[in-house]
Amino acid sequence: MLYLCMRFKFDIEKSRILKNDPRRKISFVEVQKIWNHYHYVDCRSDDPEQFRAIGWVKGKLHTVIFEIREDSEGEYYHLVTLWKSTKQEEKLYEKHT
């Protein structure tokens, strides 16, 4: 059996702000669970190269913007921002998963 270890990095202060934002109410720590289940990923922008992941966390669809970066230990996901998915993003998720 093969186990993949995904690494995530993010700004801890920004994560706290997102958790306390009444429109979001979720932190970067919690939203990492998107990668544990079916999720949809596409490229959001090329400069800088950023990706969008859409998936379920805490009973709601959420969208996370992230970058794939490297350090001395290898590749990791740098989480940039997150929000509750829009209607358009919900349709994308339904179409592709």
Predicted regions and their residues:
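Ribonuclease/tRNase effector modules and their secretory precursors
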Residues: 1-97
